[in-house]
From Swiss-Prot:
Protein name as it appears in the record: Regulator of G-protein signaling 7-binding protein
PANTHER family the UniProt entry points to: R-SEVEN BINDING PROTEIN (R7BP) HOMOLOG
GO cellular component: axon; cytoplasm; dendritic shaft; dendritic spine head; glutamatergic synapse; neuron projection; nucleus; perikaryon
Covalently attached lipid (S-palmitoyl cysteine), positions: C252, C253
Region (Disordered) residue spans: 1-45, 174-196
Family per similarity comment: Belongs to the RGS7BP/RGS9BP family.
UniProt subcellular location: Nucleus; Cytoplasm; Cell membrane
PTM entry text: Palmitoylated. Undergoes rapid palmitoylation turnover. De novo and turnover palmitoylation are both mediated by ZDHHC2. Palmitoylation regulates the cell membrane and nuclear shuttling and the regulation of GPCR signaling. Upon depalmitoylation, it is targeted from the plasma membrane into the nucleus. GPCR signaling inhibits depalmitoylation and promotes localization to the plasma membrane.
Primary location group: nucleus
High-level lineage: Eukaryota, Metazoa, Chordata, Craniata, Vertebrata
Membrane protein topology class: Lipid-anchor
Residue spans of biased composition, Low complexity class: 180-192
Amino acid sequence: MSSAPNGRKKRPSRSTRSSIFQISKPPLQSGDWERRGSGSESAHKTQRALDDCKMLVQEFNTQVALYRELVISIGDVSVSCPSLRAEMHKTRTKGCEMARQAHQKLAAISGPEDGEIHPEICRLYIQLQCCLEMYTTEMLKSICLLGSLQFHRKGKEPGGGTKSLDCKIEESAETPALEDSSSSPVDSQQHSWQVSTDIENTERDMREMKNLLSKLRETMPLPLKNQDDSSLLNLTPYPLVRRRKRRFFGLCCLISS
């Protein structure tokens, strides 16, 4: 370096300093880029699947509420029997399909047996279980109501036996809305066959939903299996950690003093 006239040394130029103190970051390898890209893409897919499953469970919850309103309407004066049963069949079929899809999606995003569990997944398990329990209960209600009305209708048929005039007057005043007293015997037989078919279909769907509920409880995460119903409503906001099942070999003896 050359000295300045006043005795000070010259500082290196900007270009020289940049060349001397140049700090370059090592370029990312292709594997690093792939790992970063695959990680973010996997997280995005998981979140999207979680949102889809959440929306599906909410729609199934709405469908269960609609079916419950239809079951309550059985026997209402303003509701026609054929149209009500057709609407119940349509709503019940759609609800069963939603329940199957929700169970499949929830089982797919649940993950392996060990590891962290997202709290939202736990809540979806609880919501789906409650909806399925209510769904099967409402199906059982509809079976009982339709069966009782059909039994009441058979008792009023000509072959059902003779009744006193007072009983006939009382029954005519208490005739359910689903019954058409002016129908012919052929119409009565057809109506009875249709109601029996609806009851059989409802029983079939109820058995299917009960089996689905059993599968849901079997595939439920371990933290949910190990907790009671009261603690399920107060889940921690932090990810839950699955615990391995402890296996005990041999016998456990109790010794009393």
